[in-house]
Amino acid sequence: MREPTAHRKARILCALILFSVVSGCATESHQAVQVEHTASSAVPYRGARNAIAVGKFDNRSTYLRGLFSDGVDRLGGQAKTILVGHLQETGRFNVLERENMEENAREAKLSGKQQTLQGADFTITGDVVEFGRKETGDAQLFGILGEGKKQAAYSKVTLNVVNVLTSQVVYSASGAGEYALSNREVLGFGGTASYDSTLNGKVLDLAIREAVDNLVQGMENGSWSPRASR
């Protein structure tokens, strides 16, 4: 038995109205997020920039190094990228990039020019010595009145300044930080936070910024010099 035309039209109309309501609820937004910088980068510096190389940055914490880890040190790689940026932003160093040596050599060859690579007296190495995440939650009246959830990430890093000729560690600087995110739902209003993977990068950036500031402070108070004595 065929459905009456009037009923068919009514169903189509309802579907169109529902689609328009759903489409009207969909919103898109975007905004620029302020990038955090080291305190050292805000202090004017008129001295000479000294060449410094960045070596390995390893994850020495237990985070992402369990039995089922694939062996790729993503945390260390992320930390090294952050370190290079913050060192350069201080205005005290000419940071030497060693990750893309083959690519740079190929581009120089294609341009028909000879490379003039610069050496450094010191290499900065780094380690993520502590890293962890935790989630805590609470409920009011067994969750009837509301519940909350808090995510926290903690990181501690250590930077070592190594003399390239003697392999001596001439200076060390550390930094640590904690980031937290919390949401609360009360009587059905609000929402609890889902897992936020960006906390890893934020807390790592915070710890490295502090370590770089301590490194620069040590240089400026004479505890170490980016130029080896001749």
Which residues does each predicted region cover?
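Bacterial N-terminal signal peptides that target proteins for export
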Residues: 2-13
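Sec-dependent N-terminal signal peptides
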Residues: 13-19
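A structural "domain/chain start" motif
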Residues: 25-95, 100-109, 181, 187-230
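A short, surface-exposed beta-strand/turn
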Residues: 176-178
